[in-house]
Amino acid sequence: MDIEELLEKPYWVIDLLPKQVPAESPGRFFAVEQLLLAHPQVEALRARKLSVLLKLYCYHDLRISTDYGETWTEDPDPGELSSALDSELYLLLPDEEALITADPGDIYMTLYNPSDDLLALVRQLATADGLFVWQPPQG
């Protein structure tokens, strides 16, 4: 399954917030997001994201790409995974046919097409790092 197909599958958000902020919110979310993406908060956020991915790496084979899937690094070492998180990251779990995307300009990561077991594991890993996993309306 390629990236385009996976991006069309059901997805969940791995986030600092437990659910989607209402659209009618008066802009506080964007002010909070801007603060979280600034130094020094962005380093703490990056560490949480990396922790989830490194722990997931202990359980699953991973492939990573920072060029929208043009090239893949199979079984990256932890340092490569850490460095890749500083770019637009595509993390493929080939044994699950699942994909995680992460962008340094976002406070969340997105998990596409997880099996029930993978979703349960990611929930546990994220919770341990103070993150939430929730599913937005699909469509």
Segments (PLM) and residue ranges:
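Structured alpha/beta or helical-core interaction and ligand-binding surfaces enriched in interleaved
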Residues: 1-109, 113-139
